């Protein structure tokens, strides 16, 4: 164990065998090309699957759409930044000169949180990283009350994000309708003129296609650091 990381290992609840993986997970691209971005990509997928599985098993009567919305709430934005801070990740982030003072930035905290998950997965195995993730998330998941929680649909959430950032609302239009009457496939385009964004999605109804397009745009906004403010 590297002495300066022994406290951090205790907070995480995991001891790295290859501490260089942790170093990379904490290193921002402003510091070096050997940064956390690839680990973030991996950790994002691992986290999404683990949370999807636990929600599927815990909320057996919840429909697919609501499960997706609840998962999105748990694996994006403020939730990740808060978890990263609670695990003291902000104290160990390695930044270049151009990003000094960015340890508390929500987007950086989100990215590092996912990167650390990716690093733990590579350093161990899926069962181990799953156990670690569930330990971190246990207080959040155990406090979920479906009677009081309000999970917004993607279009409502997108509208809220844009309004909170003084941006015009998106416009939806049908590009094509393919297939026979009983098995039609709708292709919908969602546009944000202020952000010059255009996304396309498909669904078996106009409503479903619009929801999917809104979800894609939310993901793009998240990558730009725009999230729903609580």
UniProtKB/Swiss-Prot annotation:
Give the EC number.
3.1.26.3
Q: Which residues form the RNase III domain?
A: 5-125
For the keyword Cell division, the answer is: no
**Known catalytic reactions:** Endonucleolytic cleavage to 5'-phosphomonoester
Residue numbers annotated as active site: 44, 114
For the biological process aspect of GO, one term held by this record is: rRNA processing
- Repeat: is it a keyword of this entry? no
Superkingdom of the source?
Bacteria
**Record-listed Mg(2+) binding positions:** 40, 111, 114
Q: Which InterPro entries does this UniProt record tie to the protein?
A: dsRBD_dom, RNase_III, RNase_III_dom, RNase_III_sf
Q: Report the locations given in the UniProt record.
A: Cytoplasm
Give cofactor(s), names only.
Mg(2+)
GO cellular component terms? cytoplasm
Q: Which GO terms describe its molecular function?
A: double-stranded RNA binding; metal ion binding; ribonuclease III activity; rRNA binding
Q: What is its main location?
A: cytoplasm
Which part of the chain is the DRBM domain? 153-223
Which terms are listed as keywords in the entry?
A: Cytoplasm, Endonuclease, Hydrolase, Magnesium, Metal-binding, mRNA processing, Nuclease, RNA-binding, rRNA processing, rRNA-binding, tRNA processing
Q: What exactly does this protein do?
A: Digests double-stranded RNA. Involved in the processing of primary rRNA transcript to yield the immediate precursors to the large and small rRNAs (23S and 16S). Also processes some mRNAs, and tRNAs when they are encoded in the rRNA operon.
| Family of this protein | Belongs to the ribonuclease III family.
Stored NCBIfam families:
RNaseIII
Quaternary structure annotation from Swiss-Prot or TrEMBL: Homodimer.
Q: Which PANTHER family has this protein been placed in?
A: RIBONUCLEASE 3, RIBONUCLEASE III
The identity of this protein, by name, is Ribonuclease 3
